[in-house]
Swiss-Prot record:
Region feature CPSF4-binding, mapped onto this chain: 180-215
Designated name of the protein: Non-structural protein 1
One protein family per Pfam: Flu_NS1
GO cellular component terms listed in the entry, alphabetical order: host cell cytoplasm; host cell nucleus
Gene: NS
InterPro entries in the cross-refs: NS1, NS1A, NS1A_effect_dom-like_sf, uS15_NS1_RNA-bd_sf
Molecular-function annotations in GO: protein serine/threonine kinase inhibitor activity; RNA binding
PTM entry text: Upon interferon induction, ISGylated via host HERC5; this results in the impairment of NS1 interaction with RNA targets due to its inability to form homodimers and to interact with host EIF2AK2/PKR.
Subcellular location: Host nucleus; Host cytoplasm
Organism name: Influenza A virus (strain A/Turkey/Minnesota/501/1978 H6N8)
Keyword RNA-binding set for record: yes
Any single GO BP term: symbiont-mediated suppression of host mRNA processing
Assembly behavior: Homodimer. Interacts with host TRIM25 (via coiled coil); this interaction specifically inhibits TRIM25 multimerization and TRIM25-mediated RIGI CARD ubiquitination. Interacts with human EIF2AK2/PKR, CPSF4, IVNS1ABP and PABPN1.
Keyword set, alphabetical order: Eukaryotic host gene expression shutoff by virus, Host cytoplasm, Host gene expression shutoff by virus, Host mRNA suppression by virus, Host nucleus, Host-virus interaction, Inhibition of host innate immune response by virus, Inhibition of host interferon signaling pathway by virus, Inhibition of host PKR by virus, Inhibition of host pre-mRNA processing by virus, Inhibition of host RIG-I by virus, Inhibition of host RLR pathway by virus, Interferon antiviral system evasion, RNA-binding, Ubl conjugation, Viral immunoevasion
Protein family membership: Belongs to the influenza A viruses NS1 family.
Length: 230
């Protein structure tokens, strides 16, 4: 196993522990708590994949961080912070919408890279909107936290979420996953539109209905992909 992979996991475990202590003092805002919950799932998945104990990794990560801090001057810290581009956290969904449990009458699921696409194929003839919480850097989607499809009545009928065991995805990965979700939902004559925030940062062009321009042929191909691969 690559030593950098192990040490990266150890540092991530310790930094998560620090953030958890911060949250336990009721100091974190909603985006902070949301990322904390998502990162916990990711660390569990990575720990299982690597065969590493999280508690042991956290202790090792603490030693690594302490060693770095001992060598770090205040001036170097200021320069590092100034050179790192700041990302923004954007929210279409409330915390309740993100944390709400939902179930599917006719579940369909597809894994696309490090993203999991789920939808209820029992839903027909509905008006559906896609909402997402994600971070943005350089005016482009950086990291998807969670995307969900809602009917006008507020029911959840679809979802795109990162796989905890496979961290890391690009804005193109997210765009392709959204295309698959839209294609699957539209296969049952649902009308799908996308939130303005997601339109702006997930891709640069959309039609007047608030969704990316997908030709009918591509929509049919995407829907068949879901049918054949699930």
């Amino acid at each position: 196993m690559d030593s950098n992979t192990v040490s990266s996991f150890q540092v991530d475990c310790f930094l998560w522990h620090v953030r958890k202590r911060f949250a336990d003092q009721e100091l974190g805002d909603a985006p902070f708590l949301d990322r904390l919950r998502r990162d916990q799932k990711s660390l569990r998945g990575r720990g299982s994949t690597l065969g590493l104990d999280i508690e042991t990794a956290t202790r090792a990560g603490k030693q690594i961080v302490e060693r770095i801090l001992e060598e770090e001057s205040d001036e170097a810290l200021k320069m590092t912070i100034a050179s790192v581009p700041a990302s923004r956290y954007l929210t279409d969904m409330t915390f309740e919408e993100m944390s709400r449990d939902w179930f599917m009458l006719m579940p369909k699921q597809k894994v696309a890279g490090s993203l999991c696409i789920r939808m209820d194929q029992a839903i027909m003839d509905k008006n559906i909107i896609l909402k997402a919480n994600f971070s943005v850097i350089f005016d482009r989607l950086e990291t998807l936290i969670l995307l969900r499809a809602f009917t006008e009545e507020g029911a959840i009928v679809g979802e795109i979420s990162p796989l905890p065991s496979l961290p890391g995805h690009t804005d193109e990965d997210v765009k392709n996953a959204i295309g698959v979700l839209i294609g699957g939902l539209e296969w049952n004559d649902n009308t799908v539109r996308v939130s303005e925030t997601l339109q702006r940062f997930a891709w640069r062009s959309s039609n007047e209905d608030g969704r990316p321009p997908l030709p009918p042929k591509q929509k049919r191909k995407m829907a068949r992909t879901i049918e054949s691969e699930v």
